[in-house]
A protein has these predicted regions:
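Extended, charged alpha-helical coiled-coil/arm scaffolds that mediate oligomerization and mechanical coupling
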Residues: 1-52, 56
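Flexible glycine-/small-residue-rich
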Residues: 61-65, 81-85, 108-110, 172, ...
């Protein structure tokens, strides 16, 4: 029995060594696949960002290969970026502002879901920290995405809201001591009023309404 136990122990050790060898080989293949994919992903993200008013950006996806094996192989991956000419690439969290992060997340989501069978994309305030021309660029990008996939966007920016094919107004109320969230579709008149409210606040001026109409018409959403 003791001899059998020794034989079994040696057999298990051999199986372990073989499995470890195979795992290391697979991890090495995964490293190569990551490095290849990283180069392609860098180019695609930079192209997306150039369409979002970030045409000077440089992106590097760094694959750091260590010696400790984990469920993800030997690698750790960091996304590094330079948003200004002459500056080295640094980790996203140390470089990008709120508005830049919003656009980077939009670019990432658009690239990573391009080949996937995704029925709907939801963007919750993807426009945080942006305004003006950058907001218009984000609106155009969201509109382009929506031509391929159903897209739901929560926004407080009129430039982006005007790009939507359909508009839903979300409001909160308290009834009988309880909070309720109401969602209601809007016709043209309500769309103009709500976009005007985003432009001017609670007191809607005639100028704000005219501006809202112009935004809708420019986006091709006047009906």
């Amino acid at each position: 029995a003791l001899q059998n136990a020794d034989d079994r122990r040696e057999e298990l050790r051999g199986q372990y060594r073989e499995m470890l060898r195979q795992t290391k080989n697979i991890a090495a293949e995964l490293t190569e696949a990551r490095r290849t994919a990283a180069k392609k992903l860098e180019q695609e993200i930079v192209r997306e960002l150039s369409e979002l008013d970030m045409d000077k950006v440089r992106m590097r996806i760094a694959v750091h290969t260590g010696t400790k094996l984990s469920a993800h192989g030997f690698d750790t991956v960091t996304f590094e970026i330079s948003v200004n000419p002459g500056e080295p690439e640094k980790p996203l969290s140390r470089v990008a502002s709120g508005g830049e992060l919003s656009r980077i997340m939009l670019a990432l989501k658009n690239v990573l879901t391009a080949g996937e069978d995704v029925g709907m994309l939801i963007f919750d305030e993807i426009d945080t920290g942006v305004s003006g021309h950058a907001a218009q660029q984000i609106g155009r990008k969201l509109s382009a995405i929506a031509r391929k996939k159903q897209t739901l966007c929560v926004t407080h920016l009129p430039q982006i809201a005007a790009m939507g094919d359909h508009h839903l107004r979300i409001s909160k109320s308290v009834r009988d001591g309880r909070s309720f969230t109401d969602v209601s579709p809007m016709d043209r008149a309500h769309r103009i009023d709500e976009i005007a409210r985003l432009l001017s606040g609670e007191e809607i001026s005639d100028a704000a309404r005219k501006n809202a109409e112009d935004l809708l018409d420019a986006a091709g959403q006047g009906a």
